[in-house]
């Protein structure tokens, strides 16, 4: 202590430390750090920064940094999603899920998405091909032989998701513990992940 929370930020570079390259005072940037972002000034590694597009407000840029990077790493670094593959995204109406749906759609994957029925129009507008109301529908009866499942819900949803992944496919959970033995029995790869703040993703 004192400990300052917060990971997402956006602002103008005030000063550049010795040996730091790629940015200069006055640059408009945003990014994600390991903590300390809820402050007037943030110390960040240049590897955690990207230049803010002019069309983004600082508020929008800061709001997107952590959740978009989390979705990206889940889909591509851990999930290795490719064009034409089938992906099921649990919790698609949330912040990370909404980015995941859009990224997957951009990749030209077939996107299955679960959320509450009230969010149907929103999730479909993001690019989901198939919407599943988790309250009234059994996702396991709709989404079968998935190349990838992104779990943002955990609990029973995670436990039942192993059965909808095709042999050789992948399950990525951000909120639960991947069961390696169960994954082996199903012939799939399962991984638990947390976001790694960096500018590469």
Predicted regions and their residues:
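Terminal helix/beta-alpha structural elements that buttress the NAD(P)+-binding lobe
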Residues: 1-201
């Amino acid at each position: 202590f004192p400990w300052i929370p917060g990971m997402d930020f956006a602002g103008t570079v005030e000063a550049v430390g010795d040996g730091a390259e790629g940015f200069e005072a006055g640059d408009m940037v945003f990014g994600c750090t390991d903590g300390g972002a809820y402050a007037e000034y943030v110390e960040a590694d240049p590897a955690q920064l990207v230049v803010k597009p002019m069309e983004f407000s600082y508020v929008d840029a800061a709001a997107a940094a952590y959740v978009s990077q989390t979705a990206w790493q889940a889909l591509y670094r851990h999930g290795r999603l490719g064009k034409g593959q089938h992906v099921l995204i649990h919790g698609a109406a949330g912040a990370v899920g909404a980015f995941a749906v859009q990224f997957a759609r951009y990749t030209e994957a077939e996107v299955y998405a679960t959320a509450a029925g009230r969010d149907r129009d929103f999730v479909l507008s993001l690019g989901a091909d198939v919407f599943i109301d988790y309250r009234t529908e059994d996702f396991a009866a709709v989404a079968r032989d998935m190349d990838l499942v992104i779990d943002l819900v955990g609990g029973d949803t995670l436990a039942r998701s192993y059965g909808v992944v095709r042999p050789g496919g992948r399950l990525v959970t951000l909120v639960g513990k991947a069961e390696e033995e169960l994954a082996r029995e199903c012939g799939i790869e399962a991984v638990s992940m947390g976001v790694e703040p960096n500018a590469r993703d």
